[in-house]
Regions:
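Charged catalytic carboxylate motif
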Residues: 40, 44, 101, 108
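Glycine- (often His-adjacent) and acidic-residue-rich active-site loop
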Residues: 65-107
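Short, flexible helix/strand-to-coil boundary loops that buttress conserved ligand/catalytic motifs
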Residues: 37-38, 81, 90, 120
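Conserved CoA-thioester-binding segment of acyl-CoA-metabolizing enzymes
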Residues: 1-68
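Glycine-rich beta-to-alpha active-site loop
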Residues: 70, 105-133
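Hydrophobic/aromatic residues within transmembrane alpha-helices
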Residues: 26, 63, 82, 131-133
Length: 133
């Protein structure tokens, strides 16, 4: 992997998004919570997948994760929805609307004409398991 010159496309808080030689790499970047997703994460995933979908130079999209967890050194692909971000009536985004939009991420993954490969390096639980199959 050291020979790959990944270029950061855009800075995000919950994910990393890089490209190199026709390959896009989108990775969960919340290892402290086993890469659980929250509304902000799904918005960032939608932005990154949409960009990779529209970029004609990209043929392959890798979905992966950063890690390990600083708490115990364990790697996790994704542990699903972040239960700490879940309110009384479900997930609430920064704008106050109740939504998680992970189904939109799944739809974009399934219908993009690009090859999407899940690089599952660790636990994949709940909604995280649904993303890699």
């Amino acid at each position: 992997m050291s020979d790959i010159n990944w270029q950061t496309v855009k800075e995000f808080e919950d994910i990393t998004y890089k490209k190199c030689d026709g390959v896009a790499r989108i990775a969960f970047n919340r290892p402290e919570v086993r890469n659980a997703f929250r509304p902000k994460t799904t918005k960032e995933l939608l932005d990154a997948f949409s960009d990779a979908h529209e970029d004609t130079s990209i043929g392959v999209i890798l979905l992966s994760s950063e890690g390990p967890s600083p708490k115990d050194g364990v790697y996790s692909f994704c542990s699903g929805g972040d239960q700490k971000a879940r309110g009384y009536q479900g997930y609430v985004g920064e704008d106050g609307y109740h939504r998680l939009n992970i189904l939109e991420v799944q739809r974009l993954i399934r219908f993009t004409p690009k090859v999407v490969i899940a690089v599952v390096n660790g636990w994949a639980v709940g909604g995280g398991h649904s993303l890699h199959v």
